């Protein structure tokens, strides 16, 4: 048992711009009937979220889901957050934004490579405290903000704005593309997971 979720993270929006952008996206989702207008549905470990709207079926692929089904709430996070994929979120590698080479965290037998995760762990702690969260690349020696590193196997993403869809079937590619457009062309991360 558990709760499945999908997250869209805006990696570029500033802390100051996160709430206004979130309000515009929520207004669009409400106008399209994808979610309800008021936060009334409980979100696991948080306050209320937006209930699924009458047109939810237009933005999801429910072909593998038995009937009847009902989508859970949408949680909108508008604060600096490390979003994760829940259970078993253990990335294999991360790609440097400068040289584009991967820093591997595990060897071919999936044993942890000693010290490989340390720069990321330190950067996460710094980032969560409001710092830049710089990570020095083991290959090119350049330091880059944690939010600019890619990969991480869909396990982690960092940003000031995230939308978590609880208990929804897979979001359609067309919906995800329109969602990205509504975020103003910012870099986004899409993750799915389970708690």
Description of each model-found segment:
Residues 1-93:
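N-terminal alpha-helical interaction blocks
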Residues 82-97, 121-129:
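Ferredoxin-like iron-sulfur electron-transfer modules
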Residues 91-93, 134-137:
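Residues immediately within or flanking Cys/His clusters that coordinate Zn2+
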Residues 96-99, 137-140:
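Short cysteine-rich clusters marking metal-coordination/redox-active sites
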Residues 104-106, 146-147:
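Short, non-ligating residues that shape and space the ligands of small metal-coordination modules
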Residues 112-134, 152-153:
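Short linker/helix segments within small regulatory modules
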Residues 135, 145-146:
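Transmembrane alpha-helical hairpins and terminal membrane-anchor modules
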Residues 151-195:
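Long, contiguous alpha-helical scaffold regions
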């Amino acid at each position: 048992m558990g709760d499945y979720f999908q997250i869209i993270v805006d990696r570029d929006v500033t802390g100051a711009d996160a709430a206004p952008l979130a309000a515009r996206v929520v207004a669009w989702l409400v106008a399209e009937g994808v979610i309800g207008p008021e936060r009334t549905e409980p979100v696991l470990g948080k306050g209320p979220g937006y209930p699924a709207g009458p047109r939810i079926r237009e933005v999801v692929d429910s072909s593998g889901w038995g009937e009847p089904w009902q989508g859970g709430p949408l949680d909108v996070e508008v604060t600096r957050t490390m979003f994760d994929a829940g259970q078993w979120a253990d990335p294999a590698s991360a790609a440097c934004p400068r040289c584009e080479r991967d820093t591997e965290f595990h060897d071919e037998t999936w044993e942890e490579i000693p010290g490989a995760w340390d720069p990321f762990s330190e950067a996460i702690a710094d980032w969560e405290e409001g710092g830049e969260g710089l990570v020095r690349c083991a290959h090119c020696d350049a330091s880059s903000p944690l939010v600019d590193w890619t990969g991480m196997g869909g396990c982690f993403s960092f940003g000031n704005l995230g939308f978590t869809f609880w208990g929804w079937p897979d979001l359609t590619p067309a919906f995800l593309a329109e969602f990205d457009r509504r975020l103003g062309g910012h870099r986004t991360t899409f993750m799915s997971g389970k708690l």
